[in-house]
C-alpha cells in the first residue's frame, strides 16, 4: 500500500535526522530546531524588550509627571488667580490711599479754611473799625470846626443886621409915607378925570379903587433870631460817630463767617465714608486646569505610547519570525553543502591537498553568504589582488567583526524606534501646552480690562469728590466772599446814607462825601476786589489716575513664564529621555566606529600587501577548490577522472536504499548515515579522480 505524502515526509525526517549510536553531533533536525535563536531574531527580540523597557520607563515618568503637573497646575491656578486679582489688591490699596488722602485733605482744608475765615473775619472787622474810627474822628473834627466857625460868623451877622434894621426903619417909613401921599393924590386925579369923562360921581367908585398905604410896622419888628446859632450848634452835636454803622457792619461781617464756621465744624465732626464710594474689582479665579484635562491628556499619551509600542513590537516580532525562514533555509543549505563537500572530499587525496585550500573550503562552508559577498565585491585583475580583496571582505565580515557591526546597527535601530515613541509623546505634548500657552494673554487681558474699569470708576469718583469739595467746602468760601462783598457794599451805602442825612443840602456835603470816598470807599472797594479774586480761585483740581501709570508688561511676562510650568514637566522628561537615547546612539556609533576603524586597518593592510610582490600567493598557480583536485600542476594537462554517478534511490523509500556493500560512501569512515545523501541525488556532484 502506497504511503501518504505526510507519512513519507515524516519517515524522511526521522531517518535523516534521528541520532544513532554513530552520531554525536546535532544533525539537521536539531539544528533547525534552534534556528529561531539566530542572531537576527534574538537582536530584534532584544530591541523589542528594550522598547518595552523604554516604554515602561516613560510610563513611570509620565505618572510622576502627571502628579507633578496636577500639583503644578493647581499652584499655577492659584498664582494666576492672584495675578488676575492684581486689580482687586491694587484697587484695595489704592482706594485706601485715595480715601485717606481725601479725608486728610478735606480735614486739613476745612481747618485751613476755618483759620482763613477767622483771620479774614477779624481782619475785615479790624479794617472796618479802623477806617470807621479814623474817618469818624476826621469827619467829626472837620464838621465841628466848620460849625464853630459858622456859629461865630452868624452871631456877628445877626447883631449887625438887628442894629441896622432898628436904625433904618424910621427913615424908610418917612419916605414911604410921602410916597404913599403922592400915589393917593394921583389916584384922586385919575378918579376925577374918570368922573368927568363918564359922568359918575366920586361915591360910585367907592370899593373899586384902593388907595396906597405904605407902612413899615412889620419891618420894625424884623430881627435875626438867636435860634440860628442854636441850630448850628445842633448840627455840630449831630455829626455822626458811625457807631451804629460799625456795629451793624460788624454784625453783618460776622454772620456769614459764623454760619460757615458752624457748617465746617459739623462737616469736620462727621467722618467721610470715601472708601464705601470707591469701587473695587472682584477677585478672579483661573480654572484652566479643568479645561486642560491633564489626566485625559496623560491617558492619551500613555495610550499613544502603548499603541505605538504594540505596533512597533508587532512589526519587530513579525520580522523576527520572518528572519527564522532565511536562517532555516541557510542552515539547510549549509547542511546540504556539507554533504556535497563530504562527497567531494571522498575523491580527493587529502594528504596532497594544501592546508590553505582546505581552510578555504571550510570557510566557504561555514560562511556561505560572506563568501558570496566577497566574491561579488572582489576587485583586481590579478589573482593575488582578487584574493586580497576577498580576504578583506571576509575579514571585516568575520563573526567577531560582524557581531560588532550588528550591535551598532541594532543600537541605531533601537534608537530610531525609541525616538519614534518619543515623537508620539512630543505630539501629545501639544494638547497639554495649548491651554496653558494662552494663560499669559488671558491674564494680561483680564488685568488690563479690570484696571481700566477701576481707573474709570476711580476717576469718576475723583470728579465727584472734586465737585463736592469745590461746591460744598470751597463753595462756602465763595459764599463768604460774596457775603463780604455784599456787606462792604451795604457798609458803603449805610455810610453814605449817614453822611447824606447829616450834610445833605449843606456846604459840607460835597467835602465830607469826597473825603469819605477817597479815604474809605476806595479802600473797601479794593478789599471787595480781593474777595472777588478769592471767589474766582477758590477751587481745587484733584489728580487723575493715568492708564500709562498702570504698566502690565511685567504681568504679561510673568504670566507667560508661569504658564509654562505644566508643560515644562513633560519637556524635562523628554529632554532627559532624549539625552539617554543619544547616549545609546553614541554607544552604537562607537561600535560602528570601532568596526570602521578595523575596516580601515584591514584596508591599509590589503593595500600594503598589494604592493608587496613577495606574497605567499603564487601567481602561476590558482587555488581552486570547486570540486577539482587542486594538488596537480596547472601546466600539466588535465586528465578527467572517470565519472561515477551515485545511484539514485527511490525517494523516501527505505527499502530502495543501496546496501552497504554496493554503497560507494560506505568505504569512508566519516560516513555515518548511509541514507543521508539521498536528498542530494537530484543534483549529485560529479566526482573527479586524477
Curated annotation (Swiss-Prot):
InterPro entries: PRM1. GO terms for biological process: plasma membrane fusion involved in cytogamy. It comes from the Eukaryota. Keywords: Cell membrane, Conjugation, Glycoprotein, Membrane, Transmembrane, Transmembrane helix. It is a multi-pass membrane protein. The chain crosses the membrane at residues 40-60, 112-132, 309-329, 404-424, 587-607. Residues 1-39, 133-308, 425-586 are extracellular. Its main location: membrane. Signal peptide: none annotated. Residues 61-111, 330-403, 608-690 are cytoplasmic. One of its GO terms (cellular component) is mating projection tip. It is found in: Cell membrane. The keyword Transmembrane applies. Involved in cell fusion during mating by stabilizing the plasma membrane fusion event. Belongs to the PRM1 family. This is Plasma membrane fusion protein PRM1. It comes from Yarrowia lipolytica (strain CLIB 122 / E 150) (Yeast).
Amino acid at each position: 500500500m502506497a504511503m501518504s505524502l505526510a507519512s513519507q515526509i515524516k519517515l524522511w525526517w526521522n531517518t535523516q535526522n534521528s541520532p544513532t549510536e554513530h552520531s554525536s553531533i546535532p544533525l539537521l533536525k536539531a539544528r533547525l530546531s534552534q534556528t529561531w535563536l539566530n542572531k537576527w531574531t534574538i537582536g530584534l527580540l532584544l530591541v523589542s524588550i528594550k522598547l518595552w523597557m523604554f516604554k515602561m520607563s516613560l510610563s513611570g515618568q509620565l505618572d510622576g509627571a502627571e502628579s507633578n503637573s496636577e500639583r503644578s497646575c493647581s499652584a499655577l491656578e492659584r498664582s494666576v488667580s492672584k495675578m488676575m486679582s492684581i486689580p482687586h489688591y491694587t484697587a484695595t490699596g489704592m482706594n485706601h490711599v485715595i480715601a485717606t488722602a481725601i479725608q486728610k485733605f478735606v480735614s486739613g482744608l476745612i481747618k485751613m479754611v476755618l483759620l482763613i475765615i477767622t483771620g479774614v473775619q477779624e481782619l475785615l472787622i479790624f479794617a472796618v473799625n479802623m477806617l470807621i474810627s479814623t474817618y469818624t474822628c476826621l469827619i467829626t473834627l472837620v464838621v465841628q470846626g466848620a460849625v464853630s466857625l459858622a456859629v461865630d460868623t452868624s452871631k456877628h451877622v445877626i447883631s449887625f443886621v438887628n442894629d441896622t434894621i432898628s436904625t433904618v426903619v424910621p427913615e424908610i417909613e418917612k419916605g414911604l409915607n410921602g410916597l404913599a401921599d403922592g400915589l393917593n393924590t394921583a389916584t384922586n386925579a385919575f378918579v376925577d378925570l374918570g368922573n368927568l369923562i363918564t359922568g359918575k360921581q366920586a361915591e360910585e367908585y367907592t370899593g373899586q379903587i384902593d388907595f396906597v398905604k405904605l407902612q413899615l410896622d412889620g419891618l420894625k419888628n424884623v430881627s435875626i433870631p438867636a435860634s440860628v446859632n442854636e441850630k448850628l450848634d445842633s448840627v455840630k452835636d449831630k455829626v455822626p460817630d458811625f457807631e451804629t454803622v460799625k456795629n451793624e457792619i460788624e454784625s453783618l461781617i460776622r454772620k456769614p463767617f459764623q454760619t460757615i464756621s458752624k457748617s465746617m465744624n459739623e462737616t469736620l465732626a462727621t467722618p467721610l465714608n470715601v472708601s464705601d464710594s470707591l469701587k473695587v474689582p472682584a477677585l478672579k479665579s483661573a480654572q484652566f486646569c479643568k479645561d486642560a484635562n491633564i489626566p485625559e491628556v496623560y491617558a492619551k499619551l500613555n495610550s499613544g505610547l502603548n499603541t505605538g509600542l504594540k505596533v512597533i513590537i508587532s512589526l519587530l516580532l513579525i520580522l523576527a519570525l520572518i528572519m527564522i525562514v532565511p536562517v532555516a533555509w541557510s542552515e539547510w543549505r549549509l547542511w546540504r553543502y556539507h554533504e556535497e563537500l563530504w562527497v567531494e572530499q571522498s575523491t580527493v587525496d587529502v594528504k596532497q591537498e594544501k592546508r590553505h585550500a582546505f581552510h578555504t573550503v571550510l570557510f566557504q562552508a561555514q560562511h556561505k553568504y560572506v563568501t558570496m559577498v566577497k566574491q561579488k565585491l572582489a576587485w583586481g585583475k590579478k589573482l593575488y589582488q582578487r584574493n586580497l580583496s576577498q580576504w578583506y571582505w571576509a575579514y571585516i565580515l568575520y563573526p567577531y567583526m560582524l557581531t560588532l557591526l550588528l550591535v551598532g546597527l541594532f543600537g541605531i535601530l533601537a534608537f530610531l524606534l525609541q525616538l519614534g515613541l518619543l515623537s508620539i509623546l512630543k505630539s501629545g505634548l501639544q494638547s497639554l501646552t495649548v491651554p496653558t500657552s494662552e494663560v499669559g494673554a488671558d491674564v494680561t487681558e483680564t488685568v488690563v480690562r479690570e484696571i481700566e474699569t477701576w481707573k474709570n470708576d476711580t476717576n469718576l469718583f475723583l470728579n465727584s469728590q472734586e465737585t463736592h469739595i469745590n461746591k460744598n467746602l470751597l463753595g462756602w468760601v465763595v459764599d463768604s466772599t460774596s457775603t463780604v462783598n455784599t456787606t462792604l457794599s451795604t457798609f458803603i451805602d449805610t455810610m453814605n446814607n449817614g453822611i447824606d442825612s447829616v450834610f445833605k443840602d449843606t456846604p459840607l456835603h460835597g467835602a465830607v462825601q469826597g473825603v469819605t470816598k477817597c479815604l474809605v470807599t476806595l479802600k473797601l472797594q479794593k478789599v471787595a476786589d480781593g474777595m472777588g479774586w478769592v471767589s474766582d480761585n477758590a477751587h481745587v483740581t484733584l489728580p487723575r489716575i493715568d492708564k500709562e501709570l498702570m504698566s502690565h508688561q511685567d504681568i504679561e511676562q510673568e504670566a507667560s513664564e508661569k504658564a509654562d510650568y505644566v508643560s515644562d514637566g513633560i519637556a524635562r522628561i523628554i529632554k532627559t529621555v532624549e539625552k539617554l537615547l543619544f547616549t545609546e546612539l553614541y554607544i552604537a556609533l562607537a561600535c560602528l566606529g570601532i568596526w570602521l576603524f578595523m575596516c580601515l586597518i584591514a584596508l591599509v593592510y590589503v593595500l600594503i600587501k598589494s604592493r608587496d610582490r613577495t606574497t605567499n600567493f603564487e601567481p602561476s598557480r590558482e587555488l581552486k577548490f570547486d570540486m577539482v583536485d587542486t594538488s596537480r600542476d596547472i601546466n600539466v594537462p588535465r586528465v578527467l577522472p572517470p565519472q561515477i554517478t551515485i545511484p539514485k534511490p527511490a525517494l523516501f523509500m527505505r527499502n530502495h536504499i543501496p546496501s552497504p556493500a554496493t554503497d560507494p560512501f560506505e568505504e569512508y569512515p566519516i560516513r555515518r548515515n548511509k541514507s543521508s545523501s539521498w536528498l542530494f541525488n537530484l543534483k549529485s556532484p560529479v566526482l573527479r579522480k586524477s
